[in-house]
């Protein structure tokens, strides 16, 4: 009944971003969209719908029905939240990702390399050129792999920078990674 549907709008608020696996596009998210249009009187339920690729274990989709679920907290305890976050940013969010401890260890090594670069600086958006590189990557469908490529390309050439450029790059790098949810305590 229409009154009940309209009541949903009081419980479920409009969202900027609604996320889910790409296996939920149809019928789940299409039904959710149709129901929410009634609840919100034809107003937009979510500005953006993001559909991520599946996480695979040994080439098989991780799922409850397959009985191959890995709990994120276990890996955060083993590798830290920063390393797990870095692992997920190294691949485009819409593409499937293989999940292995070897890849987590590789992510840990790579993240520790980044950590060495930013450990002794303050967070500051000083390098506007690198801010623009970050913004362009995010505007390109949240292209974190592209951005990480730019990060490590510049880290590899850090010795070519003068002292001020190096400092501004390091401060900006820390600033950007804080935006992405990383902590540097």
Predicted feature locations:
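Hydrophobic/aromatic-lined pockets within catalytic cores
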Residues: 10-13, 37-44, 88, 92-93, ...
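Single conserved hydrophobic/aromatic residue that forms the stacking wall/gate
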Residues: 1-12
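Catalytic adenosine-cofactor/nucleotide-binding cores of aminoacyl-tRNA synthetases and other
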Residues: 51-133, 140-143, 152, 156, ...
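Catalytic cores of enzymes that engage adenine nucleotides and/or redox cofactors via long glycine-rich
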Residues: 13-78
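Basic, alpha-helical terminal appendages of large translation-related enzymes
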Residues: 149-185
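Short, mixed-charge aromatic SLiMs
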Residues: 27-31, 109-117, 171-184
């Amino acid at each position: 009944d229409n009154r009940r549907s309209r009541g949903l709008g009081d419980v479920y608020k409009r969202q900027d971003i609604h996320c889910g696996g790409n296996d939920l596009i149809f019928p789940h998210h299409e039904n959710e969209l149709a129901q929410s249009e009634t609840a919100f009187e034809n107003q937009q339920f979510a500005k953006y719908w993001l559909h991520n690729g599946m996480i695979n274990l040994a080439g098989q989709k991780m799922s409850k029905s397959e009985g191959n679920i890995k709990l994120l907290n276990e890996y955060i305890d083993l590798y830290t939240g920063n390393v797990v976050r870095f692992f997920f940013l190294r691949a485009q969010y819409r593409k499937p990702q293989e999940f292995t401890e070897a890849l987590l260890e590789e992510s840990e090594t790579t993240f520790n390399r980044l950590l060495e670069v930013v450990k002794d600086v303050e967070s500051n958006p000083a390098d506007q050129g690198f801010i623009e590189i970050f913004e362009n990557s995010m505007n390109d469908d949240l292209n974190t792999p592209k951005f990480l490529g730019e990060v490590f390309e510049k880290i590899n050439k850090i010795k070519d920078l003068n002292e001020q450029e190096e400092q501004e790059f390091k401060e900006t790098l820390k600033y950007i990674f804080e935006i992405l949810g990383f902590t540097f305590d």
